[in-house]
Each structure stands twice: as structure tokens, then as C-alpha cells.
Amino acid sequence: GGKFGGGGYSVSGGLHGVGVSVVNALSEWLEVEVHWNDGKVYFQRYERGRAVEPVKVIGKTNKTGTKTTFKPDPQIFETTEFEWETLAHRLRELAFLNSGLRITLTDVKADKKAEYKYDGGLVAFVAHLNKNKNELHKEIISINKQVGDVGVEVAIQYNDSYVESVFAFAND
């Protein structure tokens, strides 16, 4: 999980790696600020896919996390309207799948902001999915098992709905 020697998150979905590379290539500008566990804050700015300057230390921190800010390139896109609900849905899922991870979605144009953080992992996700349903049992059945490098997490709660909802997530 994670880059920089592991020990990070166990599920990712295009937030780093090729995902940010593609966003960078399609942006007029992109800025990345990383609060790293060495106590430093690193920063780098890109314009149209190219680094403007080398990575630099811009401060000290006692937090960890990454902030990525970008502006889609109007030379590539005719319109740059984002579907808030689509982004919110996926980022909420990622926050559930990465228990304790805080994800903030900000739309500067619409002056809109949402924050997602769930400490309960899949159990919290199942509770969220069933919040407006009649559960057949109150306690969510859950299994969380790690064998070597392989981790499996399962959460189940039956309800009286006629339609079943089965979600499966896998990482590398």
C-alpha cells in the first residue's frame, strides 16, 4: 500500500501515480503540496504538464497528507464543468475504503466544499448504504483478516429490500 516504502493506504483508485500524471497533462497548471512524515511540507508546481521548478520544502508540519490543486486546460477542453455528485460519490467511497483517511473536495468556482472521513471502514460504508433501509439485524457482520501481504475485509447487513446491493473492491 502506498508509495515510498509501503505502510500507507491499502486501497487506491487513481489518486496517485498515473491518475495524477493524466490530470497534470490535461491541466493549465497543477500544484502538489505534500505533508510528509519527516516533518516537512514539500511543494511543486506544474504548467501544462511540465515542472516549473524542482520540488522545494515550504514549511514544517506535524501532519501527513497530499493536497492537489489544478485548473483544466482550456486549450484542451471546450468546457470545464465537473459533475459534483460523481466526484463526491467516488471520493466518499475512497474515504470509506481507507479508514481514517480525510478527503476534501473543493469546487472553487461554485464555492462548494465537502469533507469525507470515516474511521469505521467497510462497516461504516454498509451502515451508510443501509441508513434509509429496514435492517433485518442491527449488528453489521464483519470480517477483517490479514494473512501475509493479503488483506480481506468483508461487511454484511441484510435488509428487507427487494434489490440486493453487492459491492466488491480490490487493490493491487
Residue positions per predicted region:
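GHKL-type ATPase core
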Residues: 2-128
